[in-house]
Amino acid sequence: QLARSISGLPSYIKNGNTPQGIFRMDGLGKSQAEFIGPTLNIQLTMPVEYDARHFYKDSTIDSLTTDITFYKSLLPDNYKNYDPAFEAYYAGLSGRTEIIAHGTTLKPSYYFSEKFYPYSPTLGCLSTLELWNDNSGLREMSDQQKLVDAVTSAGGADGYYIVIDIDDSQKPVTADEVFLKLNKQIL
């Protein structure tokens, strides 16, 4: 998925790049926005954006807590001192809202000369590649549908969703690369 906004602004600013870190999945939704398209999206919330008891799945804490200790407890040990892993926490604290993981109806050719081609930047969400037929308007390929199907088969969109920046390579990210990144000692 592409976590870059069309503005390229920092992640703590509305419509800026998608922040790295931990989000909570809050089900699936269908957007009415023309450029997002009809494929189901994954609804996400950040810490502090919503009730803390819900985000941390802990009914014993204050619903309005902004204590970073709770967020830090979700991170693997090698990420507890890695500043980018806290972007979602600080973006939520700054008032950032409404970040979802969605597809797109935009033509990849609009961004042919960009390093993120064939993906489309958004207004701050996570964008997944989809291809649509110019004549029929029907969807021909959807990585978003594959993502939704995978989340659904894994138990549904109720859990944590982790955003990490791998690199700018022009190739698909493999599961091995993700696990390597998560297990890498970052100091």
Located regions from the model:
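A hydrophobic, small-residue-rich beta->alpha segment in the mid-to-C-terminal subdomain
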Residues: 128-132
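Cell wall/extracellular polymer interaction/catalysis modules
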Residues: 1-120, 134-187
